Amino acid sequence: MATVNTDATDKDISKFKVTFTLVVSGIECITGILGSGFITAIYGAEWARGKTLPTGDRIMLMLSFSRLSLQIWMMLENIFSLLFRIVYNQNSVYILFKVITVFLNHSNLWFAAWLKVFYCLRIANFNHPLFFLMKRKIIVLMPWLLRLSVLVSLSFSFPLSRDVFNVYVNSSIPIPSSNSTEKKYFSETNMVNLVFFYNMGIFVPLIMFILAATLLILSLKRHTLHMGSNATGSRDPSMKAHIGAIKATSYFLILYIFNAIALFLSMSNIFDTYSSWNILCKIIMAAYPAGHSVQLILGNPGLRRAWKRFQHQVLLYLKGQTL
């Protein structure tokens, strides 16, 4: 059995690392919670009023709700792993955090991939029969595809609770110049099982997202070049919108890929538990959902207007409190 073992003692992490990780990842998580919570509140309120949400808004609601859950869970894991290590390194608690983290991340990756596929089919133009067929069927199929994504995420996440992660504790490590001992935690990861379940759960949405994002960028780029050849000028609002969409899609693609890599490295325990590389993975994993939630609000006219109204109401409330 191919395994990776890492170890950590109670005293091998400095206060600076604890503070830095909690502050940076905390800011990212809080930003993401506010962004995802805002999107969930907007679309959730419409759904609660009995309105039928368009397909794109339905995907956004599921994506933002799953991200809200993910960011709250990531914040909890960071707090427990850094401040309550005795509890966190109990085998059952450790496995619970890892399994739910993988499930929420897989769900997010699937929903983000479907959102990009949906926008690609709605916006891009390619003269291919398969593309036209998908364009016609996507609205009917999307609710079933979203449900299937949740089931797939479950089926490839919960098997990780068996024969993948194990934590051992050795309480008899002597401390130099002292008669006491300290606890040493050994984390063992079955890499064969992890690679299989992780890759099976992430491979399809990753390929879907990269393909949809690439096709969308190519289509927008082709249309932008066509507009430029017609001398519409770079100041034309349509061209600016296309260039902005290309930049936003490229930015999201980079975030998506980096998050997938960081998640795998974090789950595999390749790096020491409290090493700088492992902390970097935590920061990247927190930055992806936060960054994309902000991008979704800024890039969606309806959400942008709702956010400005929300800001205005908050300012009025604060002014009323100070009077």
Curated annotation (Swiss-Prot):
Instruction: Specify the protein's topology with respect to the membrane.
Output: Multi-pass membrane protein
Write down any Gene Ontology CC term.
plasma membrane
Chain ranges on the Extracellular side, renumbered to this chain: 1-14, 80-100, 163-190, 269-276
Which residues are sugar-modified?
A: N170, N179
- Residues on the membrane's Cytoplasmic side span 36-58, 122-140, 212-247, 298-323
Which residue windows are transmembrane per the record? 15-35, 59-79, 101-121, 141-162, 191-211, 248-268, 277-297
A Pfam family of the record is TAS2R
Residues annotated as coiled-coil are none
Its keywords, alphabetically, are: G-protein coupled receptor, Glycoprotein, Membrane, Receptor, Sensory transduction, Taste, Transducer, Transmembrane, Transmembrane helix
Principal localization?
membrane
Subcellular location(s): the record lists: Membrane
State whether keyword Protease applies: no
A single Gene Ontology MF term assigned here is: G protein-coupled receptor activity
Q: Which PANTHER family match?
A: TASTE RECEPTOR TYPE 2, TASTE RECEPTOR TYPE 2 MEMBER 40
Q: What does this protein do?
A: Gustducin-coupled receptor implicated in the perception of bitter compounds in the oral cavity and the gastrointestinal tract. Signals through PLCB2 and the calcium-regulated cation channel TRPM5.
Q: Which family does it belong to?
A: Belongs to the G-protein coupled receptor T2R family.
Q: Other remarks on record?
A: Several bitter taste receptors are expressed in a single taste receptor cell.
Recorded protein name is Taste receptor type 2 member 40
Q: Species name for this entry?
A: Pan paniscus
**What is the phylogenetic placement of the source species in the record?**
Eukaryota, Metazoa, Chordata, Craniata, Vertebrata
